[in-house]
Amino acid sequence: LLSNNIIPDLVITFDPHPSRVIRWFGDLQLNEKSIKKDDYFARQDLEIMFNNELKMNSKIIKLFNKFSKKIKIAIGTSSSKKVVKRLMSTQADLYWWNPLLDDPKMNNSVSKKIYKINKLPMINTGGNVGATAWMLADALFNCKKIAMIGMDFAYYLDTPIKSTQYYDRLKKFTKEEDLKLFYTKIYNPNLKKFFYTDHVYAWYKKCMME
C-alpha cells in the first residue's frame, strides 16, 4: 500500500515471532547472516517480492520511515521486542491492547492477570491478525460491510508443501513422510475448485465461522 502512496486507516499487529513480523515494518538489523538462519521469506508464497530480502527490507524501511507519522497502529502487548522497539522509534500513533489468551472468568486466567497489570482492553483475536481486523471492524467501528482480502486459509493445489506457512515448524517434530497428514484437500463451492489447507488454517476458519 505505502509503495502506492496509500495510507491504511489502521494497521494491526500482535504476532510474537521474534524475527519475522519486524520485516513488515523494516528490520534495521537485517543482514545475510540472519537471513540464512530463517528461510521463511525465501520459501513462502505470500509475497514473491520478499525473495530479494535485503533489497525489499531496505525499501520497507524507507517507506515506513517516510509515512509513519500518518499511520495508526493497534499493537498487541504480545508483540516482539523488535517490533515494539521499531514502532516506538517512529512517529506512528500506537494504540495498545491485550490479546485474549483464555477465559477471563476463570480463577487462574492469564488474560485477567495481564489486564490487572496494564489495564489495557482485551480483544479476541481469532488466532490471526486478519480475524482481529474483522472483529475490530465489526465490534469497535461498527462497519456494516466488511471485505476480507487475502484471507484464503488455504493453498492452491500446485503450491509446494515447503512453501506453506507452518512447514518449518512441522519439520521439527514430524517425519518427512508424515508431513502430508497435516494437510487436507478442500472444495470451494463458490469458485468450484479444489484447494488444500493445513490444520492451523482450518482452525482459523472454524474460529471465523463461529
Where are these regions (language model features)?
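Metal-ion/cofactor- or nucleotide/acyl-coenzyme-handling active-site neighborhoods
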Residues: 2-210
